[in-house]
């Protein structure tokens, strides 16, 4: 009797500031899309991963959403005890079909933020002419607000819709293996996955490079039979940009006894700030207001570890909720520019979390992926790779391209705005209020 050939499935995740790539799988069970239940599970899994990452040195950035989506695509191909074990390790309470439906809804929402293809609008009576709006004055010689007179014409700046380039892309790549037709169809339908039937290493890395706008050059060093990839790419202007002329070197305390000078941005405007046990948090919105970066700043210079342990899924959810409800107030914010790259092999991390069957071809059940009984098509995950890049500057957070309208800032500031000086190691979260997803998160211990 011929020996069944073992199939290897790698899971790939990459994030470029946000770009993230990860494999995903899911099956259909039915039920209403519950996006928030889905992202709660992703966020809970993300906090568990962050605790593991935090044992190492240096800055960190990763995408809980990307990793969660990748693992969901894998989960879609599992059955029986393998499915139950994966769902438990991933904090999932939804059934396979519910996970698939919720992912379809989340992807549609997140991919809908890019309005760069939507034409700008002009004030009434004016039309777009090149890079500005132009039209004739009224009979009385006036111009419609906010246009102004320029010679014989009225001119105004076009209004662009709030926009963020947030791309969620998935792929199923076959490099020597095969999958069931209904599994490939599921990924196409619910995850908008591209399917490549003859993939090479160049195909995989080239796809990742393209989907992350070159932020992630390479994700895999070796091929497996079946490759599942998720990529998340983000770039957006701040709702209120920082003035580059105000950026200057400021002290950043690496420890109580060591300080370094780092380029630090300054902004005086209104933000939501909350005080929590051991730390303060501030919400910095992007041009699309449902997207924001949240900074969690420990009260103590060396308090990052305690705050990170305290910020589990429940505390994170409560803190984000408190920020959304908090009225904005005048704030003098100092925030260092920073750029972080990070990569992680997640196989051992998930095994530590109790996920063992998906990595054991003798005992795993991937019959949903293969379309064959487990005994005739032994299959196992052999790679879970995640890479992420983030860059924060005066204009934007980097990892994608985006256009956004400027937001008018109130010029009159009280004499004593709240001081929020990010001059010590801190945590950050890039969140989407519409779905509840933590798209990226990390820590900065040294912004240089």
Residue ranges with predicted function:
Residues 133-135, 143, 154-156:
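Short linear proline/tyrosine/threonine-rich motifs used for host-factor recruitment
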Residues 57, 95-123, 152-307, 317, ...:
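Non-catalytic, conformational "gating/processing" segments within enzyme and secreted inhibitor domains
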Residues 126-129, 144-150:
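Extracellular, cysteine-rich, disulfide-stabilized repeat modules with beta-strand cores
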Residues 58-60, 425-428:
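Short loop/turn microsegments at loop-to-beta-strand junctions
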Residues 2-5, 13, 20-120, 157-196, ...:
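Detector for small/aliphatic-rich hydrophobic stretches
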Residues 119-123, 139-144:
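Disulfide-braced loops of extracellular cysteine-rich modules
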Residues 419-424:
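Short loop/turn motifs at secondary-structure junctions and domain boundaries
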Residues 426-448:
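C-terminal or internal capping secondary-structure element at the end of a domain, subdomain, or sheet
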């Amino acid at each position: 009797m011929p020996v069944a050939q073992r199939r290897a499935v790698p899971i790939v995740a990459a994030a470029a500031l946000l770009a993230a790539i990860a494999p995903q799988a899911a099956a259909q069970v039915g039920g209403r899309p519950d996006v928030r239940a889905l992202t709660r599970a992703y966020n809970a899994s993300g906090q568990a991963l962050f605790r593991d990452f935090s044992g190492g040195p240096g800055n960190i950035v990763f995408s809980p959403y990307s990793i969660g989506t990748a693992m969901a695509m894998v989960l879609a191909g599992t059955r029986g005890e393998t499915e139950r074990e994966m769902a438990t390790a991933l904090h999932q309470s939804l059934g396979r079909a519910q996970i698939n439906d919720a992912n379809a809804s989340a992807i549609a929402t997140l991919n809908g933020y890019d309005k760069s293809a939507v034409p700008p609008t002009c004030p009434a009576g004016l039309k777009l002419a090149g890079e500005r709006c132009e039209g004739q004055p009224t009979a009385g010689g006036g111009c419609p607000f906010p246009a102004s007179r320029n010679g014989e014409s009225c001119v105004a700046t076009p209004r662009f819709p709030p926009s963020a380039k947030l791309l969620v892309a998935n792929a199923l790549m076959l490099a020597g293996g095969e999958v069931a037709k209904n599994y490939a169809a599921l990924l196409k339908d619910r995850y908008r996955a591209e399917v490549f039937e003859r993939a090479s290493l160049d195909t995989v890395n080239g796809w990742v490079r393209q989907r992350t706008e070159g932020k992630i050059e390479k994700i895999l060093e070796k091929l497996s039979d079946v490759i599942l990839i998720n990529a998340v790419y983000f770039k957006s202007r701040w709702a209120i940009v920082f003035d580059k002329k105000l950026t200057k070197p400021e002290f950043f305390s690496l420890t109580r006894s060591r300080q370094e000078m780092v380029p630090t941005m300054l902004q005086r405007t209104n933000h939501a700030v909350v005080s929590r046990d051991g730390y303060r948090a501030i919400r910095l919105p992007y041009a699309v207001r449902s997207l924001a970066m949240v900074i969690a700043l420990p009260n103590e210079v060396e308090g990052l570890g305690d705050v990170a342990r305290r910020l589990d899924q429940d505390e994170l959810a409560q803190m984000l909720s408190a920020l959304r409800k908090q009225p904005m107030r005048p704030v003098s914010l100092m925030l260092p520019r920073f750029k972080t790259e990070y990569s992680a092999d997640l196989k051992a991390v998930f095994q530590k979390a109790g996920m063992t069957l998906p990595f054991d071809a003798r005992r795993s059940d991937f019959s949903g992926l293969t379309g064959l009984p487990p005994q005739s098509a032994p299959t196992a995950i052999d790679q879970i790779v995640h890479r992420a890049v983030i860059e924060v500057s005066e204009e934007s957070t980097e990892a994608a391209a985006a256009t956004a309208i400027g937001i008018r800032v109130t010029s009159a500031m009280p004499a004593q705005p709240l001081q929020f000086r990010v001059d010590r190691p801190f945590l950050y979260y890039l969140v989407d209020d519409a779905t509840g997803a933590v798209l990226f998160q990390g820590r900065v211990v040294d912004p240089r």
